[in-house]
């Protein structure tokens, strides 16, 4: 573990607190990276954004695991998905375990005995990096609706500045699942000389019309909440929880497979018999309401709007008349692409589309399609075949760089 300069104002990750187990530091398993403390990195230089504006002065929350070698060649960047953060692995003092702790740690597929792993919380998030909840430099009040719309490309440019701070010229690998996979892909396109390997898990080179539609319905639920106040609800000391609940319920349905939902809930009733009401009747309804309530307590509505819109906008083929083959022609990285058979949010066909474009350009690609019942969320879960594939790939990287 590298020593970090700690900002006492850095908060724990509520996403991890809500969705992952807690472990008192004294009972941590031996394959944990242990107790971790995030670092707040401040950047004074303005960051040009894709929308033509710029962000003047911003913070990024960062966590690191493992040790950066003398050559600075063993660094791995982990990019997070919608509601995750910089807290990838290990445990915070409050007991929150990192969102990909089963993947990153000593002896794990991404082995911190060999690699220096970095997690960065993206701009616009609500877990410490500059976002809608942060004070606007001119007013001192939260940005709210004035926070600029950001894109995957903006996040990658910000992450590149983190790499510069560490003196990392090239990552051994950039890795992510779902939206994190889009960032990993974008890294290989925007900074081809800085990415040795690109690991894209349960992701897609662009959203389908159906996925954009899901995001629009979720955003509409938030925007129509009377407590939204045009995005400036902080001043009213309220939160659009009703909209956030519905948005999360919609999203959560897409993260699970039909098989998984059938096995977990089926048509099981909450009570012994139907009650002929519009209250909760089925266990699956109870589960969705629970997930919605939990999410609304810790997540920020403006952040949800920003991140789902960034998902919508990502389409590297757009600048090449829709040709993904042309879009990836200048990449230099080797790739590992992983999909899951029951993932209908980002179906295997989308991963195969990326693989084909890379093969058309004679890029080295390893592709794994894992037969797993858990839908899109499978990328977060511990599956022996999935982890064996990732472990073998990182073993190859370690041998290449002598880690």
Swiss-Prot record:
| Binding-site residues, substrate | 248, 377
- What Gene Ontology terms describe what this protein does at the molecular function level? homoserine O-acetyltransferase activity; homoserine O-succinyltransferase activity
Q: Where is the active site?
A: 178 (nucleophile), 343, 376
Give the first-level EC class, as a single word. Answer: transferase
- Superkingdom field: Bacteria
Compositionally biased spans, kind Low complexity: 7-26
Chief subcellular location:
cytoplasm
Write down the EC number. 2.3.1.46
Domain AB hydrolase-1: residue ranges:
74-383
Q: Which reaction does it catalyse?
A: L-homoserine + succinyl-CoA = O-succinyl-L-homoserine + CoA
Q: List cellular component terms (GO).
A: cytoplasm
Pathway assigned in UniProt: Amino-acid biosynthesis; L-methionine biosynthesis via de novo pathway; O-succinyl-L-homoserine from L-homoserine: step 1/1
Localization: Cytoplasm
**InterPro entries recorded for this chain?**
AB_hydrolase_1, AB_hydrolase_fold, HAT_MetX-like
One annotated GO biological process: methionine biosynthetic process
Write the record's keywords in alphabetical order, separated by commas.
Acyltransferase, Amino-acid biosynthesis, Cytoplasm, Methionine biosynthesis, Transferase
Q: Which residues does the UniProt site feature Important for acyl-CoA specificity point to? A: 345
Q: How does it assemble?
A: Homodimer.
Say which family it is in.
Belongs to the AB hydrolase superfamily. MetX family.
What's the stated role of this polypeptide? Transfers a succinyl group from succinyl-CoA to L-homoserine, forming succinyl-L-homoserine.
The protein's matches in HAMAP family, at most eight in alphabetical order, are given as: MetX_acyltransf
What is this protein's record name? Homoserine O-succinyltransferase
């Amino acid at each position: 573990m590298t020593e970090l300069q700690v900002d006492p104002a850095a908060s724990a990750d509520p996403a991890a607190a809500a969705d992952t187990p807690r472990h008192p530091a004294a009972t941590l398993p031996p394959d944990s990276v242990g107790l971790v403390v995030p670092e707040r990195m401040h950047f004074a230089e303005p960051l040009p954004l894709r929308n033509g504006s710029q962000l003047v002065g911003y913070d990024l929350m960062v966590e690191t695991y493992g040790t950066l070698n003398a050559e600075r060649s063993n660094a791995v960047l982990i990019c997070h998905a919608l509601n995750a953060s910089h807290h990838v692995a290990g445990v915070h003092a409050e007991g929150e375990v990192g969102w990909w702790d089963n993947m990153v740690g000593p002896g794990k597929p991404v082995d911190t005995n060999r690699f220096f792993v970095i997690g960065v919380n993206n701009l616009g998030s609500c877990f410490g990096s500059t976002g809608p909840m942060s004070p606007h430099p001119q007013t001192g009040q939260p940005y709210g609706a004035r926070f600029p719309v950001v894109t995957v490309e903006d996040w990658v440019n910000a992450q590149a500045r983190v790499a510069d701070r560490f003196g990392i010229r090239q990552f051994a690998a950039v890795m992510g699942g779902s939206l994190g996979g889009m960032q990993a892909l974008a890294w290989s396109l925007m900074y081809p000389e800085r990415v040795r390997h690109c690991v894209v898990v349960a992701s897609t080179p662009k959203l389908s019309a159906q996925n954009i539609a899901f995001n629009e319905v979720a955003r509409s639920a938030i925007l129509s909440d009377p407590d939204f106040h045009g995005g400036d609800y902080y001043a009213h000391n309220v939160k659009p929880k009703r909209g956030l609940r519905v948005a999360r319920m919609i999203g959560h349905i897409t993260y699970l497979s039909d098989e998984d939902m059938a096995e977990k809930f089926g048509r099981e009733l909450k009570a012994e018999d139907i009650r002929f009401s519009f209250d909760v009747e089925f266990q699956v309804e109870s589960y969705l309401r629970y997930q919605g309530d939990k999410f609304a307590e810790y997540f920020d509505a403006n952040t949800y709007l920003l991140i789902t819109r960034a998902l919508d906008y990502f389409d590297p083929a757009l600048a090449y008349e829709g040709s993904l083959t042309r879009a990836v022609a200048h990449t230099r990285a080797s790739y590992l692409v992983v999909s899951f058979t029951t993932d209908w949010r980002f179906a295997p066909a989308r991963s195969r589309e990326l693989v084909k474009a890379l093969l058309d350009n004679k890029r080295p690609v390893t592709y794994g399609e894992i037969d797993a019942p858990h839908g899109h969320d499978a990328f977060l879960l511990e599956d022996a075949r999935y982890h064996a594939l990732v472990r073998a790939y990182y073993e190859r990287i370690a041998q290449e760089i002598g880690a």
